[in-house]
């Protein structure tokens, strides 16, 4: 049997248990979802100079941006999210009715060289890694799955995966 580890930010803990260490770190992104904000968007709006994105969601408006590298169990600093909401009201949506909302963080698995780890686990037979995609995990997941499937089934992947090896240099 074969095992694929694709566990996001928690992959580091699983890998440590089988003797593999890679410099995987959580990259926390801050979000605020505001219901009844008075802002109606039909599509996401990037405020590049402010460093955040405004997205229409079922519950209303999501304002997201700012990231920090911190341990998984670090206490969130929601002041970061509050600053984004204030910027959105001041610079984009002066008519925003409400600025309070549901705050949360999303942890994304981040590698110091920004490349994911895709391929066999070094020194452990029948274990394959698909981790460290950062903010692009959901976007890159299907392609990564196809690449890992090709390797597991003995086929040549359509991409040279040398840069994505777990035993590469990260400096």
Segments predicted by a language model, with ranges:
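Active-site substrate-recognition segment that forms the wall
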Residues: 1-125
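C-terminal lid/capping helical subdomain adjacent to the catalytic/cofactor pocket in oxidative enzymes
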Residues: 121-171
């Amino acid at each position: 049997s074969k095992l694929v580890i694709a566990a996001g930010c928690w992959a580091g803990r699983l890998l440590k248990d089988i003797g593999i260490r890679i410099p995987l770190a959580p990259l926390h992104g801050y979000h605020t979802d505001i219901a009844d904000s008075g802002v109606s968007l039909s599509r996401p709006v990037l405020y590049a100079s402010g460093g955040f994105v405004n997205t229409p969601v079922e519950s209303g408006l999501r304002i997201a941006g700012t990231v920090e590298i911190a341990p998984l169990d670090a206490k969130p600093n929601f002041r970061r999210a509050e600053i984004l909401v204030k910027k959105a009201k001041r610079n984009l949506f002066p008519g925003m009715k409400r600025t309070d909302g549901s705050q949360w963080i999303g942890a994304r698995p981040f590698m110091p060289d920004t490349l994911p780890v895709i391929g066999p686990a070094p020194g452990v037979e029948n274990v394959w890694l698909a981790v460290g995609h950062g903010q692009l995990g959901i976007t890159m997941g299907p392609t990564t799955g196809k690449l890992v499937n090709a390797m597991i089934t003995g086929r040549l992947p359509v991409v040279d995966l040398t840069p994505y090896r777990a035993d590469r240099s990260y400096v």
